[in-house]
């Protein structure tokens, strides 16, 4: 059989009935099933002759008309695909099965492909029960002939009628006279990039179905568990939203949006007269294009390259306009019949046509006269559909759902633009909402064609072929409403499109292709433009706007020539240092939603910088509002840092100069002080208070003169013995002695004068005494330098009023003066008389001198004792203890014995921009506690300075005979850690020295320690 020539084969076309019969007896694949009326009377045990007669009679009646039609056709007509009865399933045709519509590709396949599979056990049972109509050798011969004839097929059948080019649309419907384009041989295996196994024929075995078909819609799909799957298995079970269950039909333009109609299942249309062609006329070689609805169950999923959803692009790479949620705060939730709140509907809005993206305008453009079409896909994911909604707590049943379209101005969302819809005669009418239904777990697709904007946007006129800066925009708003039975309508969901320009001119003619990039000039490899350039955003904020990071291997250069500048003034650096101290440098992370929008990685989220709002309070000109967010001019902050650095350098230079001057001055003063001290020590050794030093000096002088005379006499005698010519030398010796005596007399006068001055200073000037007996040698007064705070306290302050100057009662107790009373027990105690207290030399004079004027500290700093109602000012300064140039103020505050040993409250008022630093007690000062032994304080027992409130402190001065406390005022809270040598710089220092003045003025005072 394999060596037969096709020319030598029998002529099967002359006897089609014989071929059909041979096919019937040779295949024996499917057992013929009798009609319902005869199925009850037949059984395998009946007479085989009766069975054969039944099948022959049925075959003769069914093929009578069909045989006549085939015999009428000429030889050329047998080439029609419908005339190829080689693979005609006569058993199914005899059964009058409604599902006999086999795919066309089935006629191209032989039985060797085994597209129809039967279980081997069931096949053997059918063969055992089926009567033998022909001998076995005849069946084998017919089967071999059938295989040979199948090998003769060399040309494919006419392809299926499917518009894969998407030329059909709602605006240009296909006609019956148009012919499909020529299809090559492999067209049957082409389906938008989707591979079709088994040459497009779906086998009965459900397990061979590709997995991508099962993922056609949602994962809510189960396998087909039917025990007897039909010839065309249902890929989706009953509870799955199959395309066949869609309420609305799919628009022809929806092809290519993720679904493609399969060209595998074009059924044979049987006419009323049971003929295959439905007409006695001979059909044409080319079948006409038919506008017939495809069975939705045959829609196959065709993967589309690229992104889906809002970023799906149209054919040719044009992006589709995107829709976003709109007025979400006005959405009304839906409820089921039980009053349970349902989830939001899954809505996808797609503009099928009418919107063209303009790269020059950076937005979508719509031509007002050309309509646009919108497809809305709605799916309820809940098991129950929406039944009602609530208004003011009242549940109202839903009667219907409506889909409405309206335009809105981008700059004013409250201004709405009506949408019109053209009729089939292209007559525009006002658009009315479209009614639709929502079925649980089903997808509803609503396509609304022929829509128009009733107005055009403003400022559409171009300026020099560039976008108008005053261009206005529209937004297309899609709203889903729910209407109750009483007429109440609420907004379910709403979506707004991107901004759109609506023009009265066709966008294609408005922007010629050669003029789209007219603003860009290309000169060799250089591309230039005079307009702004935007990367990653839609609106320019500057000449170059970049939404993201900029990587540059070089530097960013900009001109700074003096020829380009005018009104050049030097900026002062006075406030730069203070502004820099107010800046706060922080580490921060961008919010996750911002990082996702800007495309930042986790490492790029962390930044170091300043906060724009905080910087605006310090440097307003460094912050700009360019639209959505505040931006920082970092160069302005940089130059402010340069100014602050210059100010620091200037302050450092001034401090260095002052330090050098002061060191030289102190060195000179120390030299003079050392010379005076040496002279005073030598003079004080020969002076006393009774004037005996003068007699001793005279005696010493006489003794010296006598000794000198005796010596000279002896020398004269020796010299006279040696040489009598030496007599004139004695005269020179007498002159020398007289000169020495004169010098000694002058020295005595000078010493007397110095003694008188020293006595005057000890009795009429401010001096210090040394209460500690352990100190080696007496320490002198301060001189012209700042007083060293060790243990000096003034003996008398006539201008400084003491704390509690007199006893307010007849009998008062004395505090912390036991040691003083022991040392001055022999002194006379006078009665206190308020009338004569001012004339008493031993009392405290609260009045100031006539030449004393209260000036304050000059820095708006006020120190007071609120409990005693006293003001501490310059009256408590002694000689050189308050130096304004150095900003050091040492205030000596006397306390009488009548002040109890209780803590004192000190209040220091400073300007709001400054801070008071509590530095505690002065360690180098000789702090002496009130006790019977009078010993100095230990490390564990020291004066205390505690802050009670802002600028209010409590010191333990009442419990100490003498104690010192230090406070510093400045712009920082770390002033106490600065070295003491940095005077006159960033802070002011106030030293409060409290000491007991124990000279009593009242005999009735009782000493209490």
UniProtKB/Swiss-Prot annotation:
Keywords: Activator, Autocatalytic cleavage, Cell membrane, Cytoplasm, Differentiation, DNA-binding, Endoplasmic reticulum, Glycoprotein, Hydrolase, Membrane, Nucleus, Protease, Transcription, Transcription regulation, Transmembrane, Transmembrane helix. It comes from the Eukaryota. The record marks 559-560 as: Cleavage. One of its GO terms (cellular component) is nucleus. GO terms for biological process: cell differentiation; positive regulation of DNA-templated transcription; protein autoprocessing; regulation of neuron remodeling; regulation of synapse assembly. Myelin regulatory factor: Follows autocatalytic cleavage via the peptidase S74 domain. Autoprocessing is apparently constitutive and is essential for transcriptional activity. Residues 169-180, 696-711 have a biased composition (Low complexity). Residues 560-659 form the Peptidase S74 domain. Residues 205-217, 234-278 have a biased composition (Polar residues). Residues 161-293, 688-731 are annotated as: Disordered. The chain crosses the membrane at residues 737-757. Coiled coil: none annotated. The keyword Cell membrane applies. GO terms for molecular function: DNA-binding transcription factor activity; peptidase activity; sequence-specific DNA binding. Myelin regulatory factor: The peptidase S74 domain, also named Intramolecular Chaperone Auto-processed (ICA) domain or Intramolecular Chaperone Domain (ICD), has protease activity and mediates autocatalytic processing of the protein to generate the Myelin regulatory factor, N-terminal active transcription factor and the Myelin regulatory factor, C-terminal components. Belongs to the MRF family. Homotrimer. Interacts with myrf-1. This is Myelin regulatory factor homolog 2. The lineage of its organism: Eukaryota, Metazoa, Ecdysozoa, Nematoda, Chromadorea.
